[in-house]
Amino acid sequence: MSGSTTGCGGPCGACKFLRRKCVADCVFAPYFDSVEGTSHFTAVHKVFGASNASKLLMMIPASRRLDAVVTLTYEALARLRDPVYGCVGHIFALQHQVMNLQAELAYVQTQLSTLQGLPPPNSQNNSRTEAASSSNVPLISSVDSKDNMSSSSSHIPCMSQQQEQEQPKEAIEVPTESVDLSTFFGLENPVDEDGDLNALAREFFTKYLTGGKYRPSSLI
């Protein structure tokens, strides 16, 4: 959308589309050139009509006609792409995009405020290590106490065993010589008439009391 006529004196884009001679005071010549102006004016003509667009531009001051031509062209192209909504569909799409961006921005701001409220990672690590060390102290003391108790309890039986070993055992003396069997069995009056009882007592003493070491003397 540039000056009225081309340098060669050809018609503007609007007059080229309308197949008419472009006059000096053509209202479309300053805004529709002969290259791209033809396609733009085609859209304006299909949507608004050439006569209606000409009347509208004549009613607007010359300082604001460029904005009006840009608006008419944008609306005409949008109506050709979307005959129902036109440029309103573009407005709805942009509003929806703005709402999505605002929601995303609010989410990011919430996450940022949450992260700013948290302490730095170094302080968190220090607090965790301090808590772990403080929790390990009673465990170590309890383990030490258990070890001391177990060691003391293990020393007690050892000491008792040592004491038992140190105590002298009383030797059990077993007579190996000949014993007066009448006195051993509590007989006040030994049997002299029959020597069988005395021999039986010697045999019993030899087997069960002296472990077979006792040798009975020969009978008289």
From Swiss-Prot:
Stretch list, region Disordered: 117-172
Stored InterPro entries: LOB
PROSITE patterns: LOB (PS50891)
Pfam families attached to this UniProt entry: LOB (PF03195)
Family: Belongs to the LOB domain-containing protein family.
Gene name, Swiss-Prot/TrEMBL: LBD31
Signal peptide: none
Listed Polar residues bias regions: 123-139
Name listed for the protein in its UniProt record: LOB domain-containing protein 31
Domain (LOB): residue spans on this chain: 10-112
Tissue-level expression: Expressed in roots, stems and flowers.
Organism: Arabidopsis thaliana (Mouse-ear cress)
